[in-house]
Amino acid sequence: MDTVQDKTYEAIYYSLWEAARRYSSFTQFRVIGKSHDDRMIPMLEIGQGDACIFCVAGFSGTDGQMTDRLTRMALELCRIYECNWTVDELYEVKKLLDQTRLCIIPVVNPDGYEICRKGYNTVRNPIFRQMLKMQDVPCDEFEGNARGMDTARNFPTTFCSRKKIHQQPASENETRALIRIFQEYGGRGLLVFCGYGKKVVYYRRDQNFHHGRWILAQEPLKTATAARQNSRSDQKMLWSQPSIRAKDSPVTSS
């Protein structure tokens, strides 16, 4: 099994592109935007359902393993769909995906992904490259994009506070790409794959786009036991945050 160090951004991009060509009857490949360092952000749609659920990973370069796993999951789902297999003798994948398709975006922040793998010299823009080097952060611990911004906390919410020059809500290309695709597609749900304890702050609007709602999404990757042990402390934290609600209304952002 390849590790994240063996999986290049280009390999991830082309694996999704090739999957769409091979399984063209029920998949669609799309570039939803470009990063500040001019890398394309790919998305693979699986299934033919009218409703969709977004599966997103790679907000931070340090979440490279989640990017790799989500890519593998997408390819495996394509194979299962084509063969019309039933998973665990319970889940009819083809039937489910023909009702609700998956929109998989495994690498939202391709610049950060490449920086963690190859170092700051992989940044093409010389100004961005020099600014990042001046921050004196080890490349394998770097969590931002090519401009040094945290894309997971760049969405227009009450949590988005300006900490750097030129930083405003939705100031980053990666953030705007997600907002556009969420607004275009709507959606029935959002799954964010990220490292333990990390949070992605995103916004949500009703279909008429008049009233904003804000939700805190996090994918902690805990075991069920650990989740139960931490339930009390988690509840205390959520009292000060917007409530997490599962609704059938379209989700229009992450």
Give, region by region, the residue ranges found by the protein language model.
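C-terminal accessory segments enriched in acidic
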Residues: 1-10, 15, 19, 23, ...
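Short acidic, Pro/Gly- and aromatic-enriched capping/linker segments at domain boundaries
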Residues: 26-34, 140
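Short beta-strand-to-loop junctions in surface cap/lid or active-site-entrance loops
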Residues: 42-50
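Active-site/substrate-binding loop(s) of hydrolase catalytic cores
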Residues: 50, 64-66, 70-211
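Conserved beta-strand elements of the Class I
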Residues: 52-55
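A generic structural motif
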Residues: 59-63
